[in-house]
């Protein structure tokens, strides 16, 4: 009695493809952000906001999803978009002691982002990036699956 229960929800898997997204109409940037957040909440894609820069990175499982997203954003929000290749090939949710995580984020700003829930994400270019983190920061954990708590 009186204890707080947490239930595990549906796991969220790291996307296999990452691309930056932008509107071809510069006047619709704010609307694009709303559209991307909506699709991330639906689970249609993962949305990452890099620590550096003003854009977004969208992650999906298959290449056709980019075309579907572009079409839905155009039809439902009236925003023409383009997806472009990024330097990143994977995303990993990162967790660990706050002090270590803060230091890591500061040193690796160019690889850090937040997901739609505000959780820290490490964007990687190569498997070597993951191995380096595991070697240099043993207190941190990189996860390819995010457990959703409800």
What are these regions (language model features)?
Residues 1-150:
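Structural and coupling elements of P-loop NTPases
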């Amino acid at each position: 009695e009186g204890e707080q229960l947490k239930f595990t929800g549906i796991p969220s898997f790291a996307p296999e493809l990452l691309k930056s997204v932008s509107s071809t109409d510069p006047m619709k940037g704010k609307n694009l952000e709303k559209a991307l957040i909506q699709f991330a909440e639906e689970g249609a894609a993962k949305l990452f906001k890099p620590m550096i820069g003003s854009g977004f990175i969208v992650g999906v499982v298959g290449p056709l999803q980019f075309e579907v997203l572009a079409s839905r954003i155009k039809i439902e929000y009236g925003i023409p978009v383009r997806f472009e290749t990024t330097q990143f090939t994977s995303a990993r949710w990162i967790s660990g002691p706050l002090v270590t995580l803060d230091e890591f984020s500061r040193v690796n700003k160019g690889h850090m982002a937040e997901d739609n829930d505000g959780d820290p994400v490490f964007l990687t270019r190569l498997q070597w990036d993951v191995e380096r983190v595991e070697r240099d920061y043993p207190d941190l954990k990189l996860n390819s699956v995010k457990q959703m708590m409800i």
